Amino acid sequence: MATMEEIQREISAHEGQLVIARQKVKDAEKQYEKDPDDLNKRALHDRESVAASIQSKIDELKRQLADRLQQGRTSGQDRDPTGVEPGDHLKERSALSYGNTLDLNSLDIDEPTGQTADWLTIIVYLTSFVVPIILKALYMLTTRGRQTSKDNKGMRIRFKDDSSYEDVNGIRKPKHLYVSMPNAQSSMKAEEITPGRFRTAVCGLYPAQIKARNMVSPVMSVVGFLALAKDWTSRIEEWLGAPCKFMAESLIAGSLSGNPVNRDYIRQRQGALAGMEPKEFQALRQHSKDAGCTLVEHIESPSSIWVFAGAPDRCPPTCLFVGGMAELGAFFSILQDMRNTIMASKTVGTADEKLRKKSSFYQSYLRRTQSMGIQLDQRIIVMFMVAWGKEAVDNFHLGDDMDPELRSLAQILIDQKVKEISNQEPMKL
C-alpha cells in the first residue's frame, strides 16, 4: 500500500502531466479553428480525452489521500500493538514492512497468455486489408518503431490510409487498422494485434513485397542482413550443396553425390516437421494463399530470407514448419546478440546499446518460437554460422571511434574556449 508521501508525489507528477495535456488541448483547439477537418477534430478529441483521464486520476489520488488521512485519525486506537494489520494471519509482525495492494480485478485468468496468440484470427484480420496500408504500418512499426511505441504506449491506435476503405450503404468509409501498444502491465487477448505480432504475421505473409521495396528494419540492417540477402538465390543453393558434417557418409536417396549434403539434412528436417504441423497452421497457410499471399514454401525460395527483414520476434507461423526457416531466424537473432556484445565492449556504444547487452534476442526468439509448437534444430544454426557468420560480422555497422588527432585538435579548441568564458576545468570530449 502506497504511503501518503508516495501518493502526494504521484499527484504532483500527474499535475505536471495535466498542465502539458491542457496546453496540447489548447494547441489542438487553435489548429481545429484554423482547419476544421476530421483529422484535427479527432486530434482535439483525443487530447481532451487524455487530459480528462489525467484529471480523473488526480481526483482518485486525492480521494485516496483523504481516506488515508481519515484512517490515520481514526485507526490509532484500533491498530494492533504488535504492528500486524487486521486480516493478516501472522501472530507476530513479519520482518518485512507492508507494501502495495495489487488490484486483480482487471485480470481475466481465462484469457490465454501472450504465448498463445490466435494466429489464424490475426491473419484473417490482416489479409482483409489491402497491401499498401499493411506495408505502411510495418514501416511505422519497424523503421519508426521506437518513436511510434513511445508516443502511443498503453493505447490502442488506428492506422488509416486512402487505399483502405469499405463501402457501407454506398458510402465510402475509411477502414482503420487497429494495433495495441501495450505497456509492461498490459494483458493482451489472444486475437489482439501487438507490434510484435503484427511484424511476425506480416513478414510471413508478404516477404516478396518487402523484398521488392527493400524494407529492412534498422535492427536487421546493422547486422549484415543486406550483405547476405543481395545474392540470396546463389548463396542458399551453394549452402544446400555443401557437405553436411551432421549426416553419416552414406548414399542418400535423391542426393546427386554419394556423400550427404545440407540439402539432404534440410529434406530430412522437412519430413519431421511435416508430421508435426497442426491443423490450425495448415488452415492459416491455406487462408493466406486464398487471400493472394505468396508464401515461402522452402528455404531456397528467392524471398525466404526476407521473412526476417522486419525483425520479427519469432518465426512467422506461415513458414514455421518449413525446414530451416525457424533456424534462419534464430541465426539472425544470434547476430543481434553478437553485435550488442561488440557495442558494449566499445567506447562509442550509446548507453542504450550498452544496456541491451544485458538482454538476449536469441533466448527471446527461442522461447517465443518454441511456444508455437516446435523445437529448433541447433545443428542447422551451426551450419548457418559456419557458412555465413564471418561475412555477417564483417558487415556489422558498429560506428567508428574518433581519429586520435581529430580528438586532440577538438579538445584544444574546447580548452581554449572554456578558459575564455569560465574558470572551471574543461571537460573531456
Swiss-Prot record:
Region (Interaction with host RPS19) residue spans: 150-175
First-tier enzyme category under EC: hydrolase
GO molecular-function terms, A-Z: endonuclease activity; RNA binding
Protein location: Virion; Host cytoplasm, Host perinuclear region; Host Golgi apparatus, Host cis-Golgi network
Gene3D superfamilies xrefs: 1.20.58.90
Annotated keywords: Capsid protein, Chaperone, Coiled coil, Endonuclease, Helical capsid protein, Host cytoplasm, Host Golgi apparatus, Hydrolase, Nuclease, Ribonucleoprotein, RNA-binding, Viral nucleoprotein, Virion
Name of the protein this chain belongs to: Nucleoprotein
Annotated source species: Seoul virus (strain SR-11)
Gene (name only): N
